[in-house]
């Protein structure tokens, strides 16, 4: 907005302040929950931040690779663990429903509080 290039600005902030952001949720994918690209999966950890690709509610945008899926994050008051589950809305990749292979438990740097 102010004509100052900001590429990598937020990455530099996260590197200088590890854990300042615990979870970064993104909702854009064109692939299945088992896919990786450049050695990276749908859930990655860097700079003390978990980056999660949490959903793709499209089926026909890129029909060969895109499938509708979403994630459920479960927090428990007083716990630093977050359960991440993957739900497949169709059976084009695996049976429709919860997809245990993509389930993860994340460990935050501090407990969750309501």
Segments the model singles out, each with a brief description of its role:
Residues 1-22, 34:
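Active-site-proximal segments of metal-dependent phosphoesterases and phosphodiesterases across multiple
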Residues 22-23, 50:
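Proline-centered loop/turn at the N-terminus of a beta-strand
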């Amino acid at each position: 907005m102010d004509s100052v290039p900001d590429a990598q600005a937020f990455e530099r902030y996260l590197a200088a302040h590890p854990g300042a952001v615990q979870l970064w949720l993104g909702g854009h994918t064109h692939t299945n929950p088992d896919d990786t690209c450049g050695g990276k999966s749908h859930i990655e950890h860097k700079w003390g931040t978990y980056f999660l690709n949490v959903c793709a509610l499209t089926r026909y945008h890129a029909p060969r690779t895109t499938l509708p899926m979403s994630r459920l994050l479960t927090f428990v008051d007083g716990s630093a663990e977050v359960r991440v589950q993957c739900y497949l809305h169709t059976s084009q990749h695996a049976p429709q429903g919860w997809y245990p292979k993509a389930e993860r438990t994340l460990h935050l740097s501090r407990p969750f509080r309501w």
